[in-house]
Structures are given as structure tokens and as C-alpha cells.
A protein has these predicted regions:
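Aromatic-lined substrate-binding rim segments of carbohydrate-active enzymes
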Residues: 16-105, 115-118, 125-128, 224-232
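Acidic-and-aromatic substrate-binding clefts and catalytic sites of carbohydrate-active enzymes
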Residues: 7-23, 36-42, 54-64, 245-258, ...
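Residues at alpha-helix termini
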Residues: 26, 172, 232, 308-310
Length: 314
């Protein structure tokens, strides 16, 4: 949040009443609440409350209300960091044959997915504002793999993705592509030296251009939903997102659609970014630094939240 004093909040996708009570007892009064309806990387529900998105145009926000009220019962002064689940419920993934969890860019290029997800977000935010607007201090948009806007589709094409790619090229003043580059072209490496893999801007022009689009399209989706949330809230509210993990994803960073972090950080519709600590430096004494390029983030007006979800010695 935009404040000068140190900021600390507690987040757990499970109920964890004892932990929340202990944090409240030491003065922590900001808690994350996630009204989830999607599953995690193990195929299990993210949370321990019932889902809120049940079918087309059918929502039940009672579990969300219960979750917030459970927090208030433990900490009457609680302020809420409200996480919005944009990922597909299992029934929607089966209905549309596209799942935003592994393939957020394919889902975003699917008109029906975007239509239904926008309707859910609208209904959820309107309800949240009506019932808990005086407690909610920010909204955090969650989508893609592990809800962190990562894409594991390896750039797979679809009719909607091709249409979006052509529109992106038109906005950039580039020639209209006949198709999305195939797998061999997308993954081709022209230069390799001491383990470093590089693409030649001439020889690999089509791949470089497509992967540029791949990340920008992901950010455009984030900003579209951020704008929607902003339009539904009549009071000043901050919006955040998990994005920009270029220091963690290593050789897969091009594929994961996290390269357009400067475009996201320059947008007035996003107020802060969130990043876990780096998972490659977890040994005792390690720093477990940020996944994001701090030198780029810090000069900009958007603060960076550090998500501390590492393992600690007993």
C-alpha cells in the first residue's frame, strides 16, 4: 500500500484460525481473503470455503461473506486485502475447452471465456463493495498458473490467439502475419555460448516478434480487468497483481508471458506488484531475493510487495 511505515499482512488460502488469531494479537490487522472457485497445481481446491462461481450467471457469495466474517470475528479491526479469482472453475474449463490455469493467454483470446469472467468479476466486486467496502483496502487480480499470471501453453495458437496477434501487429504498424509461428520456429535458438541461449533478431525475427506479443497480450488482459474493477468501485482503491518474475523463471521466462513488466508498471490502473522470494536461494544464510527486477520497479510509482512463503527451520 502507499504508506511510509512498514506494511505487513497475513495471507493463507486455508482457514488457519489459530495463526490469524496470533497475528491479530501482535497488532497485525490486515488479512488477505480469497473467494476461490478454481483448483491448485495438485488439482485440489485452493481454499476451504465453498466456491462462489457455480454456473453461467449463477453465483453464491455466502462463502465469501463467511470468510470475511470469520476474519472479523478474530480481529474486529480487520482490513481486507481482497483476492479476485479470475481462473476458470472446472465446469467452465470443460464447457469451453480452454483452461486459464495452464493457458491464460489462450483463455484471454477466447471471447466466451472473457465474457463470462467479466460478468463474474462484475458481480463479485459489486457484492464485495456493497457488503464490505468499508473494510476492503485493495483488490488483487488472480489468474493463470498458480494465480500468478504465468502461462504454460508454450505459446500454443488458436483462432482467437491468431486474431489477437494480427490486431497487435496492426497497432504496431507491422505486416499482418499469415499465422502464428510453429513450435520449431517459436523454440529455435540461433546462438548458444557457455549455456546462454540467444536468438538472432534477424534469423529469429518471427519468434522474437511473437513472444513480444505473447507477454504484452497477457498484460493487456490484466489491464482490461483492472480497468473493469476500477470502474465498479466509486471510492479510491488500490489494485495489485503478481507479475514480472524474470529472475526466477530462467530459461522459460520467454514462454511464461512475464516479460512485459515495464508496460504493466507504467499503467495507472495498477498500484502495486507482488513477488515471492526467489526459490533458488533457500539454503540457510541465503538471501532468497526478489523474482522481479527491482532496478526497474523501484524508480516507478508502484511499490513492490514481498511475499514471504519460504521454508523456515523449526
Amino acid at each position: 500500500m502507499k504508506q511510509t511505515k512498514p506494511f505487513f499482512a497475513y495471507r493463507s488460502f486455508w482457514k488457519e484460525f489459530d495463526a490469524k488469531k496470533r497475528f491479530a494479537s501482535i497488532g497485525v490487522d490486515q488479512f488477505a481473503v480469497f473467494a476461490s472457485h478454481s483448483t491448485n497445481s495438485l488439482g485440489e481446491p485452493y481454499g476451504q470455503y465453498d466456491p462462489t462461481w457455480l454456473w453461467y450467471d449463477t453465483y453464491d457469495f455466502t462463502p465469501f461473506d463467511q470468510q470475511v466474517n470469520d476474519v472479523i470475528g478474530l480481529c474486529p479491526e480487520a482490513k481486507i486485502l481482497c483476492l479476485i479469482d479470475l481462473n476458470s472453475p472446472l465446469w467452465l474449463a470443460r464447457q469451453l475447452y480452454v483452461d486459464s490455469y495452464p493457458a491464460v493467454t489462450l483463455a484471454a483470446a477466447h471471447d466466451r471465456w472473457k465474457e463470462e469472467t467479466r460478468k463474474y468479476v462484475r458481480a463479485f466486486v459489486e457484492h464485495a463493495e456493497k457488503v464490505f467496502g468499508d473494510r476492503i483496502i485493495c483488490y488483487i487480480l488472480m489468474c493463470g498458473t498458480t494465480d500468478e499470471w504465468m502461462d504454460f501453453s508454450n505459446g500454443t495458437d488458436s483462432p482467437g490467439k491468431l486474431r489477437a496477434y494480427r490486431e497487435w501487429c496492426a497497432r504496431k504498424g507491422l505486416p499482418e502475419p499469415a499465422d502464428i509461428p510453429g513450435v520449431a520456429a517459436r523454440d529455435h535458438i540461433s546462438r548458444e555460448h557457455t549455456g546462454m541461449k540467444l536468438r538472432d533478431p534477424v534469423m529469429d525475427h518471427d519468434a522474437v516478434q511473437y513472444w513480444h506479443f505473447h507477454s504484452e497480450f497477457n498484460v493487456e488482459t490484466i489491464l482490461e480487468f483492472a480497468s473493469l474493477v476500477r470502474s465498479l468501485v466509486s471510492r479510491p482503491v488500490e489494485l495489485g497483481v503478481f507479475y514480472g518474475y524474470i529472475l526466477e523463471l530462467a530459461h522459460s521466462v520467454v514462454h511464461r508471458a512475464h516479460l512485459a513488466y515495464e508496460k504493466l508498471e507504467s499503467s495507472p490502473d495498477i498500484d502495486f506488484l507482488i513477488s515471492p522470494g526467489d526459490y533458488q536461494d533457500r539454503d540457510m544464510g541465503g538471501g532468497s531475493g526478489f523474482m522481479t527486477p527491482n532496478g526497474t520497479v523501484l524508480p516507478r510509482p508502484h511499490p513492490l510487495w514481498a511475499l514471504r512463503d519460504g521454508r523456515f527451520a523449526p
